[in-house]
């Protein structure tokens, strides 16, 4: 620190300490004070606060909550969770903007701007709450996604495989936290192709074709292997819950103390448990009706079965019953169709126009809930031997998968049309807001943002004097946005919180491209024009 006259001048190190200290305070204030100062629970939150093999729930967040329940108790753990999520978000956002500041030599005011833009994904439920104050996976995934972007940018900028390996590791973490983020394996595949093709190596230019082949083949293997590993991880997690008594008892002790007390008082050892299980089976054999009632809810399904079935059932028509030759499946389809049609969750009830996507998302999203018990009741009434079979879950899933795939094949054109109708709103979610009175204008603004960003990116790639890192940054954001929008619209049913991960990063990369354009061309031309 140097005192010059009456003014105190700070050196670079002191300025940086003061600057990053202010960012820490701003981040903690934003994540812990702004919005709600209480934990915010949603309908989905219950799926994470209990250790259960629930469809679509990945292992990381329930285990994270279980650890906090164990450390802080059921009365205080939610407050600990939102503090931990807030601190993690603060660390990740500051690391992200610091990476950009160091790479692009940003002014302090520019870094502040980038910091506030980076907060945008966390504000989808404002003014009620920040994402870090919610007991949902987004409390962790939005923050960790910035670490993914950091290592992915390093991989793209340096063309080094060690950074790519880091981005792949972050993808595994994110996919184990949120199932939809398996999409990022596709992004990693594209980045791998880019690195292989652009990496400087000794050899002839003709080897570019060989590199492209290696990149495509390697990217495909990475994508498929990643999805396979995550599926096995999820299956292992569910198997742990169902079969590992030590883990189940520990979870019961932490999450349900009353049930644990009952368990201890029962003094149930393995021999007694086996005797009671044998007695229960004998009772079921003697009382068929009792057996049916007990087994009706004993089924498991996968997220993929539900997605295929829901997307297909939304496209259903009454005459589609004739598509199924099997009498059991045909009867099941009729029962499912009647349930869905009664709730007006088919495509025929969707409004036309720009808001059609809302009815599509609502219909597809509710079909699974509407039809959850229909197969069980149908089997119990008409084919009770299926319910009593040890393969009940497998038979149920096979029938639902067959129905979903058959309907999608029969109405594939309509399915693509409805998917296409969801794309515009999905793209809007990635970079802009959906405002009812000016909804058409929202489409036009989004189109302008994407086209202008694409034009600026291409110009940077063409101009060899320009810093191509800005263009590579935008290419990563646009590419991941396109992959997310298409896959989520095709496979899942788009929700805003699935699509806003790159919201702030898009405007940051857009600003960097504009800055590069100004510094490289417009400013010099403006100076020459003034002199003239």
Residue ranges of predicted features:
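Membrane-interface alpha helices of multi-pass inner-membrane proteins
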Residues: 164-178, 219-227
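Aromatic- and kink-enriched transmembrane "portal" helix at the membrane-lumen/periplasm boundary
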Residues: 59-62, 78, 82, 115-141, ...
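Transmembrane-helix signature of polytopic, membrane-embedded enzymes
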Residues: 96-124, 142, 162
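Membrane-interface transmembrane helices that cradle and orient dolichyl/undecaprenyl
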Residues: 146-163
